[in-house]
């Protein structure tokens, strides 16, 4: 393309990226200094906060005021106190604390250039999978679950998985996380039974959510590794794979989908949720930034395009493969 045919250069894209980086820097600094935990449930004056944190008062004031502007702190004549989001998600001791996830991901992202040069991951994904990282990653839904469950249930209605059309469904939620994506089905239909599969630490979050929703007796919690756990044979009407397949190479994804096919009853439905890359890999921002995050931990990972998902599902024996939304693909095990 000639220079004359191009759009005029717009610096706003660069400015917007820099603005995002400034906000992240403020959040990182506050987490590293343990600002939110130090302030806790009370109100601290600047001098009290500086003494407790071990910081220069003037410099700390600049940081705390910026946190107020970002809505994470509130400021009064008495001093600083936590905003509702900071109290829920950024203060240690909260059951929905997620600050360590933010710090760990930020530290990994700062090493992106090293990963690109070497092709080697910044850390061991297996260590993340077996530890508390994903439990903390899911924990914010202990606060936000009500709205999310309603949104997810609306999606299930669009897919035709409801009490009147699929009564008493047997559902397998693979890598279930907090459970918000499937648990609404059990609340709507008392006869629904869900097998929630994930690591033991993550299942503790899912158990808390099920208890709050009053559906614990309808959920079977199964601790296991999604790469190797036996999923059963012809047991389920629906299998849900949420934001999972892009952790797998095509060969490993095919292996998982083979097990999913066997786990489904004939005529059963697999629902794949994923950030789907456009075919040219140049336009879908969420999908392509997800690919960057995955690269940090698992260089062999792949954010797939729609055509690639169709090939994976078709190769595993599924039919009626359809894109049903921005991040949803469904397919059926033939009867």
Describe the role of every protein-language-model region:
Residues 166-177:
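Conserved class I S-adenosyl-L-methionine
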Residues 178-189:
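Conserved SAM-binding loop of SAM-dependent methyltransferases across substrates and taxa
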Residues 316-335:
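Core SAM-dependent methyltransferase catalytic element
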Residues 254-266:
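A short glycine-rich, Lys/Arg-flanked "PGG" loop and its adjoining helix->strand segment in the class I
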Residues 215-226:
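Conserved SAM-binding strand-loop segment of SAM-dependent methyltransferases
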Residues 17-21, 29-30, 61, 65-168:
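Conserved Class I S-adenosyl-L-methionine-dependent methyltransferase catalytic core
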Residues 273-315, 320-321:
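C-terminal alpha-helical "lid/dimerization" subdomain adjacent to the S-adenosyl-L-methionine
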Residues 227-239:
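A short acidic, Gly/Pro-enriched loop at the edge of an enzyme's catalytic core
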């Amino acid at each position: 393309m000639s220079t004359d045919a191009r759009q005029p250069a717009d610096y706003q894209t660069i400015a917007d990226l820099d603005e995002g980086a400034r906000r992240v820097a403020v959040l990182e600094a506050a987490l590293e200094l343990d600002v939110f935990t130090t302030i806790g449930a009370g109100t601290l004056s600047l001098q009290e906060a500086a003494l407790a944190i071990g910081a220069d008062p003037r410099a700390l004031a600049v940081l705390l005021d910026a946190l107020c502007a970002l809505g994470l702190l509130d400021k009064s004549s008495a001093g600083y106190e936590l905003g509702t989001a900071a109290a829920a998600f950024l203060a240690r001791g909260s059951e929905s604390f997620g600050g360590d996830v933010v710090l760990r991901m930020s530290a990994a992202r700062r090493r992106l250039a090293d990963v690109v040069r070497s092709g080697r991951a910044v850390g061991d994904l297996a260590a993340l999978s077996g530890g508390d990282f994903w439990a903390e990653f899911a924990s914010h839904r202990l606060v936000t679950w009500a709205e999310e469950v309603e949104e997810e249930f609306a999606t299930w209605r669009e897919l035709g998985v409801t009490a009147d059309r699929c009564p008493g469904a047997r559902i397998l939620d693979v890598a279930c996380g907090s459970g918000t994506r499937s648990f609404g089905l059990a609340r709507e239909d008392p006869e629904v039974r869900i097998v929630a599969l994930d690591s033991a630490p993550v299942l503790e979050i899912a158990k808390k959510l099920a208890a709050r929703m009053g559906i614990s007796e309808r959920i079977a919690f199964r601790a296991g590794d999604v790469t190797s756990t036996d999923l059963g044979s012809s047991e389920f009407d629906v299998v849900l794979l949420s934001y999972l397949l892009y952790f797998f190479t095509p060969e490993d994804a095919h292996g998982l989908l083979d097990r999913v096919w066997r786990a489904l009853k004939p005529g059963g439905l697999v629902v794949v949720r994923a950030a789907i890359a456009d075919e040219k890999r140049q336009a879908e921002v969420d999908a392509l930034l997800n690919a960057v995050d995955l690269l940090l931990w698992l260089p062999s990972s792949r954010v797939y395009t729609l055509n690639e998902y169709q090939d994976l599902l078709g190769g595993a024996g599924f039919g009626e493969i359809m894109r049903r939304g921005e991040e949803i693909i469904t397919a059926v095990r033939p009867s």
